[in-house]
From Swiss-Prot:
The chain crosses the membrane at residues 5-27. Residues 173-183 have a biased composition (Basic and acidic residues). Interacts with PTPN2. Interacts with microtubules. Interacts with VAPB. Interacts (FFAT motif) with MOSPD2 (via MSP domain). Belongs to the RMDN family. The keyword Membrane applies. Signal peptide: none annotated. Residues 1-4 are mitochondrial intermembrane. Residues 28-463 are cytoplasmic. This is Regulator of microtubule dynamics protein 3. It is found in: Mitochondrion outer membrane; Cytoplasm; Nucleus; Cytoplasm, Cytoskeleton, Spindle. A motif (FFAT) lies at residues 146-161. Keywords: Coiled coil, Cytoplasm, Cytoskeleton, Membrane, Mitochondrion, Mitochondrion outer membrane, Nucleus, Transmembrane, Transmembrane helix. Residues 153-192 are annotated as: Disordered.
Length: 463
């Protein structure tokens, strides 16, 4: 009996639970249909879904309430479309504002840049007027210029690659007064305008055979700021290894500003030559020599009447040939000789050019069998030179600038030794030993002196 009652209660509970679940499901479905949103969007406007249409049909049983819902939903649709239009307009307006803001920012940067440039130019002008040193008139030249002059005496203390050349700067009284007058007139007539005093640059100093000095000036307009930069470059080039590195970086940083000036370009080529000498890695040496040769070529394109351009082009050709094969070295040898001779014709007082030509002659006279055969196969007229020609060029360099280079005196001793004059060779070795080591060549020559002196003395005793 108890089992029957228990079964009856369980069955009744299941029926009641099923009925309650059905009621809850029907209520949930009805509420869900009533609260469904207008979410579908076609061509930028909102519309009903299929389920919502069914809901509106079900509501037709109550006419008044259905009309209210229909009108309310129509207004909501219109309101949603208007809100969508407003939002799209706001987005477009925001994009236009961003575009305008970026344009204004770029315009502001341009204006600030122009104002800063103008102020810097004015400040440079003021500094040039106030702080440029007063330069007295000299007898060497009558123009404002940078030039090189061969020195005598203790010239071995000069720059490594210049070999006895010092930088001078002079300004004539007439030019100084003319410059002051023109600046005063421009100050009265023009306000807030950059005033640059253009100068003439001279690079060639030609000495007359009758001891009457005649200066040949190669003119190139250079402003005072560039002139000061070139003077600083010359000073650093004449200094230590670190100063030469500093000078190279100084010129490299100003290449964009002054890369069109011949005087700047050949000095940059000279700095590349310095860096080639300083560098220890073979690939770095080749890279510096190659890039320096390109700068020297660019300088020559500005005009071929500048001795320094020809000289440094030849030097860099020689430095580059050290890292090339026999055929390329022979081809470069012709180019080297051509430009060194051109430099001598333009500037016959340059002892370094005679020294370089002497080295070329000495190396050609000592070419090996393979190199001679290669030159004969490549050229109808292969390069030729004698030890005597090399000696004459070395002696010319020593005559122009006594004590020009320890390496030059050692090469003079080698020439005399090759010609069989051991006594004179020993004399020049002793003279070379008296000079200090200035360049890397000088340091290498010290070892050569130590090796040659005893051998030369023994040969002299045997004779």
């Amino acid at each position: 009996m108890s089992k029957l009652i228990l079964s009856y209660r369980i069955g009744l509970g299941l029926v009641v639970g099923a009925a309650a679940g059905a009621v809850i499901y029907i209520v949930f479905r009805r509420n869900r249909k009533k609260t469904r949103k207008w979410t579908s969007k076609q061509n930028g406007y909102y519309s009903q879904k299929g389920d919502e249409l069914d809901t509106s049909n079900n509501l037709q049983a109550i006419p008044g309430e259905a009309d209210i819902l229909t009108g309310s939903r129509g207004e909501q649709l219109d309101l949603l479309n208007r809100l969508d239009y407003v939002l799209s307009s706001i987005v477009e307006l925001h994009q236009e504002v961003e575009t305008l803001r970026s344009s204004l920012h770029g315009l502001a940067e341009d204006i600030v840049g122009e104002v800063r440039t103008h102020l810097e130019e004015n400040q440079r002008t003021l500094r040039r007027r106030r702080f440029l040193p007063h330069r007295e008139r000299t007898d060497s030249t009558g123009s404002s210029s940078i030039y090189f002059t061969a020195t005598s005496g203790a010239a071995h203390t000069d720059a490594e690659s210049e070999g006895g050349y010092s930088t001078a700067y002079a300004e004539s009284d007439f030019e100084r007064e003319s410059s002051r007058a023109s600046e005063a007139e421009e100050e009265d007539e023009v306000s807030c305008e950059t005033i640059r005093t253009m100068r003439r640059d001279s690079v060639d100093l030609v000495t007359d055979d009758d001891d009457d000095e005649a200066t040949t000036i190669a003119t190139d307009p250079v402003d005072e700021e560039l002139t000061l930069l070139l003077q600083k470059s010359d000073e650093l080039h004449s200094g230590s290894t670190e100063q030469q590195r500093e000078g190279f970086q100084l010129l490299l940083n100003n290449k964009l500003l002054y890369g069109d000036h011949q005087e700047f370009l050949w000095r940059l080529a000279r700095s590349y030559s310095d860096m080639c000498t300083i560098a220890e890695d073979a690939q770095e040496k080749k890279s510096f020599a190659s890039e320096g040769k390109e700068e020297a070529e660019a300088a020559l394109q500005k005009g071929d009447q500048n001795a320094e351009c020809h000289k440094w082009f030849a030097i860099l050709c020689g430095q580059l040939s050290e890292h090339e094969g026999i055929q390329k070295r022979i081809q470069t040898g012709y180019l080297f000789k051509e430009h060194i001779e051109k430099a001598i014709s333009l500037k016959p007082g340059d002892a370094r050019c005679y020294y370089l030509l002497g080295r070329w002659c000495y190396e050609v006279s000592n070419l090996g069998w393979l190199e001679r055969k290669t030159a004969s196969a490549l050229y109808e007229n292969p390069p030729t030179a004698t030890v005597h020609e090399a000696l004459q060029n070395f002696l010319k360099a020593e005559d122009l600038t006594p004590g020009f280079s320890k390496a030059a005196r050692v090469l003079i001793a080698k020439c005399y030794k090759d010609l069989g004059n051991n006594a004179t060779a020993a004399h020049w070795l002793k003279l070379a030993a008296d000079l200090p080591n200035v360049t890397q060549e000088d340091r290498e020559s010290t070892t050569t002196i130590e090796e040659m002196l005893p051998a030369t003395a023994e040969e002299e005793l045997l004779v």
